[in-house]
UniProtKB/Swiss-Prot annotation:
Residues where Fe cation 2 binds: 130, 192, 226, 229
Keyword Manganese: no
Cofactor note: Binds 2 iron ions per subunit.
Organism from which the protein derives: Plasmodium falciparum (isolate Dd2)
Subunit structure, as described in the record: Heterodimer of a large and a small subunit.
Protein name in UniProt: Ribonucleoside-diphosphate reductase small chain
Alphabetical list of CDD domains matching this protein: RNRR2 (cd01049)
Family membership: Belongs to the ribonucleoside diphosphate reductase small chain family.
Cofactor: Fe cation
Enzyme class: oxidoreductase
MF terms in GO: metal ion binding; ribonucleoside-diphosphate reductase activity, thioredoxin disulfide as acceptor
PROSITE patterns from the UniProt entry: RIBORED_SMALL
Keywords assigned: Deoxyribonucleotide synthesis, Iron, Metal-binding, Oxidoreductase
Length: 349
């Protein structure tokens, strides 16, 4: 197995980058969406309909960990070879750890900083959703791993597993007040849109093989949620008056691509489960280009999607994906227009 790529390959923050962040933060003092709305204590009238629409999509997609059927997963897991088991364990360990980082970013930063009432509703709901993701990954680890020592090692993956630590460090370095809001919202979009992409794709590979139904169904729901969260980051960024130079955004995205590529193609190579690492690298680039376009930037990789079976999942920024009943799963009536919600007595039974 390849050596773990050390996070030192990713530059932390140079003096020039620090100076740019300070300059950008100075510009953000007068950002409308970061300044408190005077005396707005009620939701209506909706002032940001696009932001509110994202909240309603999230609400329509709500699910709980108890609804994931894991009854046949353990039998499937025990039939996997050792490489496949190793891969699944470490991917789940990363997911379980990363949700804690995302939650910290939401609770201590974005929910407090963004002053749009509609956005606060979304962030509050996202915190609940991320809690469900975290619970689901913990349940999966608990279900698959019966050795208590190994299970605890996976639950503390950031400290114990270098491949996971490297990804977590890159994500965690953006949870601070030293960088501008614009940089942090872009980096957060990269965490949810790029740093999860290879692992989501790999689990969908198991779905193609009709294995691990509980894991793959939860992956479908969670990847859908994270796709919406990624697009929401892009929407919030689009509302900023003081946007970043395109080169800065591209640099952040390229860093995220390098981190994800080193994780899923080198440190924990997807070859372990029979996937092609070269094609996986191309897929990560494809996802990154879609994110760049969502952020209003030009593509830098110009890579095509090598996995046509991934076309319909949420990582590619298709927010209309949420208007479909993914896996027949959407709260009834939540996305319906109020004018269409009519009570009638003339239906034939």
């Amino acid at each position: 197995m390849a050596d773990v790529i050390n996070i030192s390959r990713i530059p932390i923050f140079s003096k020039q980058e620090r100076e740019f962040s300070d300059l950008q933060k100075g510009k953000e003092i007068n950002e409308k969406i970061l300044n408190k709305e005077s005396d707005r204590f009620t939701l209506y009238p909706i002032l940001y309909p696009d932001v509110w629409d994202f909240y309603k999509k999230a609400e329509a997609s709500f699910w709980t960990a108890e609804e994931i059927d894991l009854s046949s997963d353990l039998k499937d897991f025990e039939k996997l070879n050792e490489n496949e088991k190793h891969f699944i364990k470490h991917v789940l360990a990363f997911f379980a750890a990363s949700d804690g980082i995302v939650l910290e970013n939401l609770a201590s930063k974005f929910l407090r900083e963004v002053q749009i009432t509609e956005a606060k509703k979304f962030y509050s709901f996202q915190i609940a959703v991320e809690n469900i993701h975290s619970e689901t990954y913990s349940l999966l680890i608990d279900n698959y791993i019966k050795d208590e020592k190994e299970r605890l090692n996976l639950f503390h993956a950031i400290e114990n597993i270098p491949a996971v630590k490297n990804k977590a460090l890159w994500a965690a370095k953006w949870i601070n007040d030293t960088n501008s809001f614009a940089e942090r919202i872009v980096a957060n979009a990269c965490v949810e849109g790029i740093l999860f992409s290879g692992s989501f794709c790999a689990i969908f590979w198991f779905k193609k093989q009709n294995k691990l139904h509980g894991l793959t169904f939860s992956n479908e729901l969670i990847s859908r949620d994270e796709g919406l969260h990624t697009d929401f980051n892009c929407l919030i960024y689009s509302l900023l008056d003081n946007k970043l130079p395109e080169q800065i955004i591209q640099n952040i995205v390229k860093e995220a691509v390098e981190v994800e590529r080193s994780f899923i193609c080198e440190s924990l190579p997807c070859d372990l489960i029979g996937m092609n690492s070269r094609l996986m690298s191309q897929y990560i680039e494809f996802v990154a280009d879609r994110l760049l376009e969502c952020l209003g930037c030009s593509k830098i990789f110009h890579s095509k999607n090598p996995f046509n079976w991934m076309d319909l999942i949420s990582l590619q920024g298709k927010t209309n994906f949420f208007e479909k009943r993914v896996a027949d799963y959407q709260k009834s009536g939540v996305m319906a227009q109020r004018k269409d919600q009519v009570f009638c007595l003339n239906t034939e039974f």
